[in-house]
A protein has these predicted regions:
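Stable alpha-helical elements in mature extracytoplasmic
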Residues: 12-16, 20, 43, 65-69, ...
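Periplasmic-binding protein-like
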Residues: 34-47, 132-142, 146, 192-231
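Active-site-proximal beta-strand/loop segments in catalytic clefts of secreted hydrolases
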Residues: 11-13, 50-51, 94-97, 173-176, ...
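N-terminal segment of the mature folded domain
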Residues: 1-89, 96-99
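Short beta-strand->loop
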Residues: 59, 72-82, 87-103, 107-145
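Soluble non-cytosolic domains of exported or imported proteins
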Residues: 3, 11, 41, 63, ...
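Extended ligand-binding regions for polar small-molecule ligands
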Residues: 51-67, 215-235
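Ligand-binding pocket segment of bilobal, Venus flytrap-like solute-binding proteins
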Residues: 109-204
Length: 235
């Protein structure tokens, strides 16, 4: 326990609420969310790529998806296959799926793309050898596996300012983070001043197979420590 118990939980995605409910159900415990949470804002989870790299893959005219990245990751020529040997191998930045919304959404997106389905994933989908091979190929390109996207974007901006080689070829982030980065504000601080935009901007590429959204739910907790007055006040 760190501080007072919360009355409201606002995770970046409703996916975390579903995971919590599943864990509670497995222990025969009641759900902690009161009603259906409202969404405060919505932003898609995208591939953030240095603009020249995205253009080399055909952006914005040609669709780019998880399978595009898998094929590039598996190609021993790396970026040389797209006439840019100076960029080396394709590298991916991705946060830990147990700690970060974009990392979780990215992992789910990989499996959806690998199976080609848009309906609920089944255990047989996840254990399919072909599916697992595609996901493993994508994950093999992950050279930086951090805790938050802010770490990646800070390092990307530092690399942009100091060298001509991008920190990573692509990083999985929320679209809003791309907007902030291109302003020279990779941490997204509301009161940031004296910003210097990057020399090479990032572009937000929505996976052609489809993407998940961070819906930022406002969830009022239905817990023993929450009083009726607190519940009413939180509404």
């Amino acid at each position: 326990k760190d501080g007072p118990y919360p009355t409201v939980w606002t995770p970046a995605s409703s996916t975390w609420i579903k995971l919590l409910n599943a864990q509670l159900a497995a222990k025969d415990k009641p759900e902690l969310i009161n009603g259906t949470p409202e969404s405060l804002m919505v932003t898609p989870v995208v591939f953030a790529m240095p603009k020249p790299m995205a253009e080399a893959l055909g952006w914005p005219k040609k669709p780019i998806g998880w399978k595009t990245l898998a094929a590039l990751a598996a190609n021993p020529q790396g970026w040389a296959a797209y006439n840019h040997p100076e960029w080396g191998q394709f590298t991916l930045g991705k946060t830990h799926p147990e700690l970060s919304t974009s990392g979780l959404a990215g992992t789910i997106g990989e499996f959806y793309a690998a199976t080609g389905t848009t309906s609920d994933l089944k255990t047989t989908d996840l254990t399919n050898p072909k599916t697992q091979q595609i996901v493993k190929t994508i994950e093999s390109a992950v050279t930086h596996y951090g805790d938050t996207t802010l770490t990646f974007l800070n390092n990307q901006l530092k690399s942009d300012q100091e060298t001509k080689t991008p920190y990573v070829s692509a990083v999985i982030v929320e679209e809003k983070s791309v907007i902030d980065y291109n302003k020279g504000n990779p941490t997204g601080k509301m009161d940031a001043t004296n910003l210097t935009p990057p020399r090479t901007p990032l572009v937000a590429v929505q996976p052609s197979e489809g993407t998940l959204y961070s819906d930022n739910p406002y969830a009022i907790l239905k817990a023993p420590w929450v009083t009726p007055e607190q519940t009413e006040g939180a509404k």
